[in-house]
Structures are given as C-alpha cells and as structure tokens.
Amino acid sequence: MKYIRKIPATDKEVSTKLVADGWIKLKEPSNLGVSILISVPFMIINGIIFAIIAYYLYPPLKELFNINNDLSITFTVNLVTFLYVIMFFIFMTIHEFLHASFIPKAFSSDKVYWGINGFVGFVYTTEKIKKGRYLIISVMPFILLSMILPFILSILGWLNWFTLFLCLMNAMGSSVDFLNMCLIAVQVPRGSEIINNGFETYFR
C-alpha cells in the first residue's frame, strides 16, 4: 500500500480497454464534490443513527434535550485544541486504514493507495474486488467506529463529548461510502467483480 496526495485521474486508454473487455461503467457522480453533495441524505441518516446510540450511552447528552436547562457552549483555542485537531486527523486515518484492512492483501499490494486531500481521506485501489467484499470494505469503518466503538468507550469510561464528536464525524463522513454502496447494490449483479480507474468504476 502506498501514500498518494490525491486519487489518480481517469486513464481514458484504460477505460477503452475495460469496455472492450466486457466491463460495464457504473452510473455514478463524476467527482468527489458531487458525490458529497448527493450523499447528504446518508449523512443525515448516519448522524441520526449515531445520535440514537449516543443518547442511550451518554447521560449528559440527554440534558441537551431538557427544555428546562439553558444550553451554553464555550469554545477556547489553546494547545489542547490543536491536540484535538491532530486526534481528528488520526481518527480519519484510522477510518481509511479500516477500509484498506478489508481489501485482500492490501498492505502488500502495489495497487492499493491511501491519502488525505484537505479534510477528506480516501483509499483507492485498482485491484479487482468482488461485489460482496466491496460492500464490506465500504461499511466497516462506520460499523466499527460509530456503532461498536462508542460501546467500548462507554465500558472503559472514555466516552466524552470529544470522543462522541469523533464518532459522529465518522458516521456523517461515511455518507459517500453509503452512496457508493447503494450504487453498487443496485447496479452490479451478484458475484460480479469491480475495478476502479480514477473516478470511474467498472463491473463485470
């Protein structure tokens, strides 16, 4: 697995060869910006799912819904704030490595890449992946970091506003993953293989 700064551009020659070999292009957004915009409904749904989990795990959260209490938010920038920012990027990196860990032989493959472009992390591969495996790769960071991790943190006594925030950002940030899952689930027949070429996805 290698580090890259951004997802490679689509190679038109590779696209032509894939089509000639019987691969079918997936109908999908043309770039990440459009994908994020279209995935907003998933962002909201994922956020609600996590909020329900957090509501029952973290009692102080219930106070936000108590109309008899005044809500006061104070934000202070100091050294701890910068540590929080660093932890946020570490958490985002963990999200991407969880994607990668479910790609067969990802850490020894020269066809698997990861990176962070601005505030958006990504894992990219040109390996052929079965549909079922692709869906697992896509959903696992959400399940592990936004559904299972809060329970573990609660048991350990480490569940607080900041760890809740990290889990929430992971849940909402998984929206593009869920969009891709829906596109794959609807368009790709069972048992098919999937391959990426830049921002284009093909199946056969």
Name what the model sees in each region:
Residues 1-59, 118-204:
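Metalloprotease/metallohydrolase-associated module, dominated by Zn2+-dependent proteases
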Residues 60-77:
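Perimembrane loop-to-helix junctions flanking transmembrane segments
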Residues 63-66, 87, 96, 100, ...:
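Short acidic/polar alpha-helix capping motifs at helix-coil junctions
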Residues 72-77, 95-97, 124-126, 156-159:
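Short amphipathic alpha-helical segments, especially helix-boundary/capping motifs
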Residues 75-91:
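Short pre-active-site segment immediately N-terminal to the catalytic Zn-binding motif
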Residues 89-94, 115-123:
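Hydrophobic, membrane-facing alpha-helical anchors
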Residues 91-104, 141:
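Active-site recognition of the HExxH zinc-binding catalytic motif
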Residues 99-112, 187:
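Catalytic Zn2+-binding segment of zinc metalloproteases
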